[in-house]
Amino acid sequence: MKDESVLNVLMYLFKNHMQENCTLDLGEKKLLVQLEELGFHRTVIDQALSWLNNLSYSGREPMQLPQKNSFRVFSDYECDLLDTECRRFLITLEQQAILNPHTRELVINQALELSCEGIDVSLLKWVTLMVLFNQSSEKEALASMELLVLDDTVGGIH
C-alpha cells in the first residue's frame, strides 16, 4: 500500500503523467482506477486532483504584482507553517529568478494547502516544480527547478 499522502499522489502523477508535455485529464476514470489499483485511497486521490485543479485555476487569475524594490513579508500564519528554512528557500529561488512574484505566491498558496503534510523544503521543491510546470511561460525556470529537485532525489523519494 502506498503512503497515504496527497504529495505522494501528486509526485506519482507528475513523474508518470505530467512530464513530456502530456496533458492530464483530471476527470478521467481510467486515471482514478489506476491510482486506486496502486493502493492510493480514493479520498487522498480526490484531494490530490482537487489540489491540481486549484493550481490550474489559480494560475490564470490576474495578480497585482509588487513594486520592483518591494520585499515579501510573511504573515504570522505563513510563518507558523513555513519555517525559516522554507522562507529562505523561497527567497533564494526568487533571487535566482526561478520564481517571480506571481509564481512565488502560487507556490506559497499551494504549499499552504498541503500544510497537513508538514511543510518542509522537500515539499516546497515539489510544489514549486508543479507550479512551474503549470505555467507555460516559465520553461527556463522549470528546467532549473527540475535539476534542483532531481539532484536531491537521486536516491529516491522519502
Swiss-Prot record:
Coiled coil regions, renumbered to chain: none
Q: Which InterPro entries match?
A: Smg
Which family does the record assign? Answer: Belongs to the Smg family.
This one is known as Protein Smg homolog
